[in-house]
Design a protein with these regions (language model features):
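Beta-strand/loop-alpha-helix module characteristic of Rossmann-like adenine-cofactor folds
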Residues: 2, 7, 107-156
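Class I S-adenosyl-L-methionine
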Residues: 1-100, 107-108, 130
């Protein structure tokens, strides 16, 4: 059985990693995440670390994962909030998953403007069609928090 340690991180260049996470990372061999995640955490990785970029098509990434019994994955914010942990659970249902979440960007926004997070309708356009956003607008949802990507931005 494969084990995935999925660590949620922020976009901050100065990452706060708990002692438990730093210890896990120092003992790790195989790491994965997006290019941006690698830029943010490379200084914490062991010198002989193997890095697997998370890129599309994901089948290629998961083929590389098959070679390793333990993988430490860095993901944005809360890995279960429209995140990569959901993909791992869907593609590898028998894998053991240990999560270390942090705040996601919409939680950070809500905290900054003192908005109770549960009052916000949240949706993701990351790699998804516009349908959910269109539906929220048609329903007249008052507060909509939207996760975007490089293709679906507030300007598009």
């Amino acid at each position: 059985m494969q084990t995935f340690y999925i660590i949620g991180i922020s976009d901050n260049r100065n990452q706060f990693l708990s002692p438990e996470i730093r210890n896990l990372v120092s003992q790790g061999k195989v790491f994965s995440g997006g290019k941006r995640h690698h830029e943010l955490v490379h200084a914490y990785l062991p010198e002989d670390a193997v890095w697997i970029d998370i890129t599309v098509p994901l089948d290629t990434v998961f083929s590389r994962y098959e070679e390793h019994p333990e993988i430490i994955v860095f993901a944005s914010g809360d890995p279960l909030f429209f995140g990569f942990a959901n993909t791992v659970m869907r593609k590898l249902p028998s894998a053991k998953i240990i999560l270390f979440p942090t705040f996601n960007s919409l939680q950070m926004l809500a905290h900054r403007i003192l908005l109770p997070y549960q009052e916000m309708q949240t949706l993701s356009l990351t790699g998804r069609p516009w349908d959910a956003f269109d539906s929220a607008l048609i329903r007249g949802d008052k507060l909509i928090g939207v996760l975007t990507d490089r293709e679906k931005t507030p300007a598009t």
